[in-house]
UniProtKB/Swiss-Prot annotation:
<comment type="function">
    <text>An essential GTPase which binds GTP, GDP and possibly (p)ppGpp with moderate affinity, with high nucleotide exchange rates and a fairly low GTP hydrolysis rate. Plays a role in control of the cell cycle, stress response, ribosome biogenesis and in those bacteria that undergo differentiation, in morphogenesis control.</text>
</comment>
<dbReference type="InterPro" id="IPR036726">
    <property type="entry name" value="GTP1_OBG_dom_sf"/>
</dbReference>
<keyword id="KW-0378">Hydrolase</keyword>
<comment type="similarity">
    <text>Belongs to the TRAFAC class OBG-HflX-like GTPase superfamily. OBG GTPase family.</text>
</comment>
<feature type="domain" description="OBG-type G">
    <location>
        <begin position="160"/>
        <end position="327"/>
    </location>
</feature>
<feature type="domain" description="Obg">
    <location>
        <begin position="1"/>
        <end position="159"/>
    </location>
</feature>
<comment type="subunit">
    <text>Monomer.</text>
</comment>
<dbReference type="Pfam" id="PF01926">
    <property type="entry name" value="MMR_HSR1"/>
</dbReference>
<feature type="binding site">
    <location>
        <begin position="212"/>
        <end position="215"/>
    </location>
    <ligand>
        <name>GTP</name>
    </ligand>
</feature>
<feature type="binding site">
    <location>
        <begin position="166"/>
        <end position="173"/>
    </location>
    <ligand>
        <name>GTP</name>
    </ligand>
</feature>
<dbReference type="Pfam" id="PF01018">
    <property type="entry name" value="GTP1_OBG"/>
</dbReference>
<dbReference type="GO" id="GO:0000287">
    <property type="term" value="F:magnesium ion binding"/>
</dbReference>
<dbReference type="GO" id="GO:0005525">
    <property type="term" value="F:GTP binding"/>
</dbReference>
<feature type="binding site">
    <location>
        <position position="193"/>
    </location>
    <ligand>
        <name>Mg(2+)</name>
    </ligand>
</feature>
<dbReference type="GO" id="GO:0042254">
    <property type="term" value="P:ribosome biogenesis"/>
</dbReference>
<dbReference type="InterPro" id="IPR006169">
    <property type="entry name" value="GTP1_OBG_dom"/>
</dbReference>
<dbReference type="GO" id="GO:0003924">
    <property type="term" value="F:GTPase activity"/>
</dbReference>
Length: 348
């Protein structure tokens, strides 16, 4: 499936139905009076967060969406039916912005969450609505109210338990394909991964979602190599697994490059829990591995893990560390969401 994390769409809610101009016609009743019903309300345009989606690719092929118009009112005081809503199905993590691309309208992060983007127009009043003691036969009815129209931006930030970050060709895609059923493109050259990939990792009786973020380079926070869009996906990850290629020139410098970009992007990316690992250790000799581990340890100020997805070396330890970090991050989020307990005293 192709990946699309940004789309521009045009929406319009339904117009309200017109009120009816009608009079009661029955045998032996000469002046039956008005009986025109009201028009139905137009349909709304609603964005709904659904499961089973992880891309906005559907909005590449259709960008115009319109809800149905309300039915016109009818005689015998029959009101028109309400117009059908237009439902925009989006994946969890979708943000909806105004046409300027900066004003946030909604942030849909949970399955089942919805937001009304454009409200349908009200139906017009039929002539029965205008009957008074001094005007027994009104000959007026209102047209329906026009619907709302607007242009919006949809932006997707993938929601995952853990995210893989690192320089291009650090072994992220190989790691994801080894520990999950995801099958990203893998090749021995930089920028093989051009779009974020999601995989479900099963470990024991537990499962968690792992995101492979395309390789970041220096200047990513300024948009170099589409890095600013890729960094946006990191925002929704609870934990980061930072992979550093053991075969790179200097593991410490490679680590600091990514940390610098996370800090420069902001939004707390550099404050997220992080597990550091030296990857592709099967590609270097023992002496090089020792030197790279020492450099990475000095830069990260912690003892990094070392692994090889190709030979399945230390994958179990890495997944255990990831699960522990995910659980700790989840507990911290729940604790922060709970209201602070207040002590009660009868004299207060």
């Amino acid at each position: 499936m192709k990946f699309l994390d940004q789309a521009r769409i045009y929406i319009r809610s339904g117009d309200g139905g017109a009120g009816c101009l009608s009079f009661r016609h029955e045998k032996f009743i000469e002046f039956g009076g008005p009986d025109g019903g009201d028009g139905g309300r137009g349909g709304d345009v609603v964005a709904l967060c659904v499961e089973g989606l992880n891309t906005l690719i559907d909005y590449r092929y259709q960008q115009h969406f319109k809800a149905k118009t309300g039915t016109h009112g009818m005689g015998k005081n029959r009101a028109g039916a309400r117009g059908a809503d237009c439902i925009l199905k989006v994946p969890a993590g979708t943000q909806i912005f105004d046409e300027d691309g900066e004003t946030l309208i909604a942030d849909l992060t949970e399955i089942g969450q919805s937001v009304c983007l454009a409200r349908g127009g009200n139906g017009g009043f039929g002539n029965a609505h205008f009957k008074t003691s001094t005007n027994q036969a009104p000959r007026r009815a209102n047209p329906g109210q026009e619907g709302e129209e607007m242009t919006l931006w949809l932006r997707l930030k993938l929601i995952a338990d853990a995210g893989l970050v690192g320089l291009p060709n650090a072994g992220k895609s190989t790691f994801l394909s080894t520990v999950s059923a995801a099958r990203p493109k893998i090749a021995d050259y930089p920028f093989t991964t051009l779009h974020p990939q999601l995989g479900v990792v099963a470990y024991g009786d537990r499962e968690f979602v792992l995101a492979d973020i395309p390789g970041l380079i220096e200047g990513a926070h300024e948009g170099v190599g589409l890095g600013d869009r890729f960094l946006g996906h990191v925002e929704r990850c609870r934990v980061l697994l930072h992979l550093v290629d053991a075969g790179c020139e200097h593991a410490g410098k490679a680590y600091k490059t990514i940390r610098k970009e996370l800090a420069a992007y902001g939004n707390g990316l550099d404050e997220k829990p992080e597990i550091v690992a030296l990857s592709k250790i099967d590609t270097v000799d023992a002496e090089t591995l020792k030197n790279q581990m020492a450099r990475l340890k000095r830069a990260a100020k912690r003892t990094p893990l070392k692994l090889s997805a190709a030979t399945h070396t230390n994958l179990t330890e890495t997944l255990q560390s990831l699960l522990a970090a995910i659980d700790a991050a989840g507990a911290a989020q729940e604790a922060a969401a709970e209201p602070a307990a207040t002590s009660w005293h009868p004299c207060d």
